[in-house]
Amino acid sequence: MSSDPKISITSFLECLSEIEEEFLRDKEKNPPVLVSKLQELQQKTPNNIANLDHDPETIQKIHQTTHRINVAVKAFICIDQTFVSLRSDAVEDASRALKKANASSPVVGCRELSEDLPAYHMRKHFLHTLENPYPTQEEKETLVRLTNESTARVGQSIVNRPPLEVHQLTLWFINARRRSGWSHILKKFAREDRSRMKHLVRAKLSSSNQSTPPSPTSEYPSNNLDDFLSDNLGRPLTPADKQQFEDDWASMISWIKYGVKEKVGDWVYDLCAASKKTPKPGMPRPVTTVAKRQPARKTKPAAKPKSRTANPRASTTPSIDSTLDSSKLESTPELSMCSTADTSFSTFGSSLSMSHYDPFQYGNDILQSPTFKARGNRKVKALPKRAGKQQPDEVENGKIPFLCLSVAFV
C-alpha cells in the first residue's frame, strides 16, 4: 500500500484487491498484518473521499471486491464457530462415556498388555535376569508378594484365583526356562554351561544395543557374539548356525514378553479351568460331543428261561415193523427193554438196575422172536405200548404176558 496520504480511486481498488488476495491465500498466517492494512486504509479513505474520481466502473469493482471480502469473512467466522461447537460436544460426549465406563467397572490404571497376566512380575524378573534366571529365596518371596498384590488390584475377574505360593513360583521358573527355549539355547549354544550362557547372553544384549548389567572382569578377552558362538560350538560359525541362534533368541524373548495367554486369548485358560471344576447343583451339564462320546457297549440278549416241563422220551430203537411215532411214546423201563429184546437180550444181565425185572416169567420161549403163533396160526407181533394206562384185568388174566406188550393181529 502506498504511503502517500492522498489516495486515488485506482489505488484504493488495488489496495482492496491485495487485502482480498492475502486474506484468501493467508500464506503468511499473520492476521495482524491484514488488520494493520485495513486500519491504514480506513484512516486514509474518509479524508480523501471527496477528491476521488467518480469512475462508475472502478466504483463497481470496489463494491464487488468488498462484497467478496465480506462473504469470505462471514464464512470463516461461521466455520470457526461450528468447529468450536463440535469440539465442545465431542469433549462432553467423551467425558460422559468415561464416567459411565468408570461407574460400571473398576478403575484400572493404564498398563501394558503383558501386565494383565498374573505372571507379569515373574516374566519381568526373567527378562531382566536372562543370563541367570534362577531367583534366590529372597527374590522368590518378593515376587510372590508383588504378584499377589497386583492380582488383588485387578478386580472381580480373577477374585476366585488362589494366591500364589513360593513352590508354585519355583515350578513356574522351571517350566519357563524350558518352554521359552532358554534351556534349549543353554544346551545347544553354551554346552550346558551356565557360565558360558551368562557371557553369551551378555554378548547378545551388547550386540543388540540393549542394556546389560555390569559384569566383573571376564576371562574371555573378546565380547563379540560370533566369537562366543564359535567357541561354544567348537567349530567355525556358519550362517545357518547364526540364523538358528537368532530364531531361538527371538522366540525366547517373545514367549517371555507376551506368553501364550495373550496370543490365543484369555478364554482358553478360562475354558480349561472351567472343565476341571466339579459342576455345582443347578448348573447346566456339559454336552458330550461326537468326538467324546463312548461307543455303545454291546449287551448279550436276555437268555430265555428254560422250560421245567419234562418232554416225553421214547426208546431210540423201535420194535420190528413198528410204524408209530416214537416221540409220542412213554418213557418206561419196560418199554425200553421190550423194544430191544430181540437185538440186545444180553444187556439185561449186565445192567444192575434191570436185574429185578423178569420179562419171561410166563414162558422162556414166548419172546424169543417178535412174532409167535397164536390161534389159527395167526402171526402176532409185539408192539410198543401206547401212552396210557393198562386195564388191570388184562394183566391179571395173562392176556398180555408183560406190561409193555400189546397184541395185534395181522
Curated annotation (Swiss-Prot):
Residues 111-410 are annotated as: Highly conserved between B alleles. It is found in: Nucleus. Keywords: DNA-binding, Homeobox, Nucleus. GO terms for biological process: regulation of DNA-templated transcription. Residues 1-110 are annotated as: Variable domain between B alleles. The B locus has at least 25 alleles, and any combination of two different B alleles yields a multimeric regulatory protein, that activates genes responsible for the pathogenicity and for the sexual development of the fungus within the corn plant. This is Mating-type locus allele B4 protein. It comes from Mycosarcoma maydis.
